[in-house]
Every structure is written in structure tokens, then in C-alpha cells.
């Protein structure tokens, strides 16, 4: 049986759970990961922490789950042991308005042992994959201009971290 300890960083009532909440399975470093993520994203908080009781996959009294919000999105992290690992089959997408925002998230999420990957992807130091994407890509897609989209996508395929100015230049055929 698990015990619950509220560790909310804000006052007030706990929000109603989202219909769909992302659940992240960590080996034994969920607390470190959650503290890192909450430090990276604005409007983020740890809402609740549960600890293992007499039964479960972890030693009694150690952190089992952590409910947290990242910029308004609810997540739960689990210290579940080494059974499962993250893969690129699942990633979290961060939509960015400016190059400054892209640079910020890229640096934070790929740093300290993370890995830069092609096409705006990074794998953080915990093995979780993220896509750092400029909103400009969606704007071009919504325009419906196939030639412009093709030119932009060719540029996308050559980049690791997205460069909005470079994407715009490519999309315009310059």
C-alpha cells in the first residue's frame, strides 16, 4: 500500500485530472527528473508525491509517484525500476514562437548529458525524447502551398536545432 504526501508548490485545490495524462516510467530517478522538468518549464509545479508502503516495486518510504504540471499539462512520474526504458517511439513536443524559445529549450533539454538529434529532436539526460518545434512550421502547413512546404521540409531534414530564419528563407525559395 502506498502513502501519499502532498508537496504542492502552490496553494489551492488540486486540479481535476485531465482525461488523458502522460505517465512516465523511470528506473529510480523520477524525483530528479521531475525537479529538472519543473525548473525548465514556466508555470510548472509538483502537485503530489506518493511513497512506497510495504508492498510494491520500491523500498518502503521511497518515492513511488510524483504528480506534476508542466506549463499547464498534467503528468505522473513513477519510480518503477529497470523494467522499461524510454524510446523515440514516444516524444513530447514543445511548440515555440521565437528562436529565443527554441534556443532556450534546446539548451536546457539537450544539456548535461542529453543528446541532440536531427529534425528538432533532443533526448534529455533521462532518456526522454523531445521535439522542439517552431510554430512557423504549422503556419506553412496550414497555408496549403505544396511547393513552399516541400522547400521548407527539405531544410527541416538538414537541421538538428531548428533555425526559424533558415526555414523561412527555404520556404520562400531564397
Feature locations, PLM:
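Short loop/turn microsegments at loop-to-beta-strand junctions
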Residues: 21, 63-64, 117-119
